[in-house]
Structures are given as C-alpha cells and as structure tokens.
A protein has these predicted regions:
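Helix-loop-helix hairpins and the membrane-proximal interhelical loops
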Residues: 1-47, 138-186, 203-204
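C-terminal ends of transmembrane helices
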Residues: 21-30, 71-78, 122-134
Length: 226
C-alpha cells in the first residue's frame, strides 16, 4: 500500500472502532436499563461486593464513566457510603479492561472480518424490527460490536503497511519507554478512551510496528491518561 492508502486505512479503522465502541456502549446501557442502579445499590454491602459490582457492571456496559457517574449520584443521594463508593470505582477500573481482553482473545486470533459483518447484519435487523426498546438497544450493541471488530481489522492492515515503511525504536532505554508512555497518554486524551488507545497498541504490536514491551508501555500510558 502507498502512504495515502495506509493513512486512509488507519484513520478509517480508528473511526470505525470509536463509532462501534460508542454504539456498543450506548446499546448495552439502554438494554441494561435500571439494572445498573439495582446492582450498584444492592451489591455494595461489603468492600468485596462493591469491588465485584464495579467489575461486573463496567464489564457489561463497557463504560467506567457511566459507573462512576452513577456511583457519585448514589453517594450524593445518601444511598452509598464513601468507602463503598471507592471500592466500586476500583472495580470499575478493573472492569474497563474487558475491552482489551476481548480484543486480545478474539480480535487478534481470528479472521474477524468473517465475524464482524454477520454481527452488523443481525444487529441492524434487530434494530429495525425491534418494537421493544431493549431489543432495539441490543441490536445497536451488536452492530457496534461488529463495527468495532471491522475497525480492528483495518487497523491491523494499516499497521502492517506502516511496519514496512517506518522503523520505531525497539530498545528498552528510559527515553524510549517514556516516549511510549507519552504516546499512550496523548492517544487517550485525544480520543477520550483508554480502551481505544489500548486496542491501537495491540494492533500495532500485531502488525510488527511496536514491540511487545513498547505496546505495554503505551497501554500503561493509556491508563495514566484516562
């Protein structure tokens, strides 16, 4: 691929991934409905219950921000103590890594184009035929999941092309590590999503543009930037 095609594929892949993640998050939150509030309200009796609730709810709705806002609302309403809220937030930060695990276990090991297009098709059918709000929301989430995987496939293609033209530092010097941390921070701040930055790092490592250690530094930077 030439430079124009590579950069176009890269920007399109990032756009599809962000759009898919947004649709998946919004759809899952609508499908969950008041379950988010019920789990947070009833699952914070002990610190371990609170931690588990944070992990579970964030893993389902794929948005630690939504869990954080709901938790703060419960604290302000006097339904949840500050100690329990802190453990919920700890769990939310663990649960938000679910996207990275999904990408690493599925998106990097299978031919995801074959999975993404059927998901988009089924999701659109559910969205258009869903008379109930929950069914339509589930369709939106499935279509978003498919777009997310399609974006990852485009990122892999783009980074494989970049790896043939660009040679990034592969050493483990302090300067290289700090620069890779900075890349992770900047990506997260620019896209307002540590999950997106994490996925870009994984795709870059898969395409040979980054070493595993470099990708790990970018992921750590993404978690700092969040």
């Amino acid at each position: 691929m030439d430079w124009a095609t590579t950069l176009g594929t890269l920007s399109g892949g990032i756009g599809l991934f962000l759009l898919g993640m947004s649709m998946m998050t919004d759809g899952l939150k609508l499908a969950a409905g008041p379950a988010l509030e019920r789990v947070l309200a009833s699952g914070t009796r002990t610190r371990w219950h609170a931690l588990g609730s944070g992990v579970l709810v964030t893993g389902v709705v794929q948005s630690s921000s939504a869990v954080t806002v709901a938790t703060i609302g419960f604290v302000n309403a006097g339904l949840l103590g500050l100690g329990g809220a802190l453990w919920v937030l700890f769990g939310a930060n663990v649960g938000t890594t679910m996207t990275g695990w999904i990408v690493a276990l599925l998106g990097m090991k299978f031919k995801i184009e074959a999975l993404s297009l059927p998901l988009i098709g089924v999701g659109v059918v559910l969205r258009l035929t869903g008379t109930a709000q929950r069914r339509g929301a589930l369709g939106t989430a499935l279509a978003g999941f498919g777009l997310l995987f399609l974006g990852i496939a485009m990122l892999q293609t783009a980074f494989a092309g970049l790896a043939e033209r660009v040679a990034l530092p592969q050493d483990r010097t302090a300067l290289s590590v700090v620069s890779q941390l900075g890349v992770g921070v900047v990506l997260t701040v620019a896209m307002q999503s540590s999950s997106a930055a994490m996925t870009i790092a994984l795709a870059a490592a898969q395409g040979g543009l980054l070493s595993p250690h470099g990708a790990a530094a970018v992921v750590i930077g993404a978690n700092i930037g969040t």
